[in-house]
Amino acid sequence: GLVLCVIGVIVSPQVAFLLSQNFWLGILAGVFAFGAWGMGYNLSAVSYLSLATELSGENGRGKTIAVMWFMMIVSIIATAIGLSRMVDPYTPEAMMRAFNMVGIAALTLGLLGLLWLEPRTRADSAQATAEAYTFKQMTEAITRNPVGKTFFVYLFLLLAAILGQDVLLEPFGAEAFGLTVTQTTRITSIWGTFVLIAILIAGALEGRVAKRTVAQAGNLGALAGFLVIVASGFVHSTSVFYTGVTLLGLGTGIATVSNLSLMFDLTVPGEVGLYIGAWGVSNALSRLAGSVLGGVLRDAVTQLTGQALSGYLVVFGIEALMLFAAVLMLSRIDVSAFRRQAEEPAFVEKVALAAE
């Protein structure tokens, strides 16, 4: 998974330049690059989260997630700062060189992190084999569990909104306020800094405040961030925009830790991989939806209105509505009810037991 992600990162800037020279060849290269990244991300994420669930224990999951995402956001901030310097002054060669360096650094750190992460024993191998689940099994496990279905949709809406803005904030800053490449690159650093602060806050609240309460606070913070960013486009104010970025960062950090901790709780002992795999499917679908919102829909609205800014504002507005729907759904998610429903035999199993 890591190797596929690195290949996608290194090839992606070349795809952007190739599209302007040979459109169809660029599309083909784009399918390869982003397909490799997507497959690599999902291969890595599901196994990584399953391992984190098993190693952390129920009481330490919030702190484990806080540490995981703390390190991830630190790397995002460091990468954003490094990229802003490596591409200044901007040239296509500088951009490709910067992406190559990021890819090599990620591969090196990732391989070092894998050393002794999961000692292999025969028992481990047998358990890994026993926990190989099909897509059909994951689908059945979720569809027969009402709380599971609600959480699947909730996670989809939440992540699609939060992840969908990832590719929009920087070009929006350039379009709405005329920010330079260096200035827009630093938007990620600002956002990441407040995500980092929020992760530390969420980690400190672990065990002191109910997870759903913390998750709802994060969801509402991110929702407020989107609304303020939309407002900044109408009033043409960079100070309002940066306020929205700050709120979005704080909300994203709190929501990330608390919702992932909640996701880890929504598993059943002995079938952790089954449910983490199902939540991974929701994550993958949310990334697809976020990409469609950030790319296809934005371009479609821009073409219809003739104004590039309108495309961004419409997408941010839709993402705010998705977060609002997620806020309403969170109250229906109960861990105890989920586990009771997960452990209850399916209808076919009940018939078989009755026949015996």
What is the predicted function of each stretch?
Residues 20-25, 84-104, 296-323:
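A membrane-interface helix-boundary motif in multi-pass transporters
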Residues 1-4, 207-220, 307:
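Cytoplasmic membrane-interface "Motif A"-like loop-to-helix N-cap segments
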Residues 62-87, 280-293:
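Glycine-rich segments within core transmembrane alpha-helices of 12-TM secondary carriers
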Residues 167-184, 299:
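Short amphipathic helix-loop junctions that connect adjacent transmembrane helices
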Residues 213-259:
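C-terminal transmembrane helical hairpin of 12-TM major facilitator-type secondary transporters
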Residues 87, 198-213:
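Helix-to-loop junctions at the C-terminal end of transmembrane segments
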Residues 1-24, 220-236:
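C-terminal ends and interior cores of transmembrane alpha-helices
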Residues 121-152, 341-356:
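Juxtamembrane intracellular "pre-TM" segments in multi-pass secondary transporters
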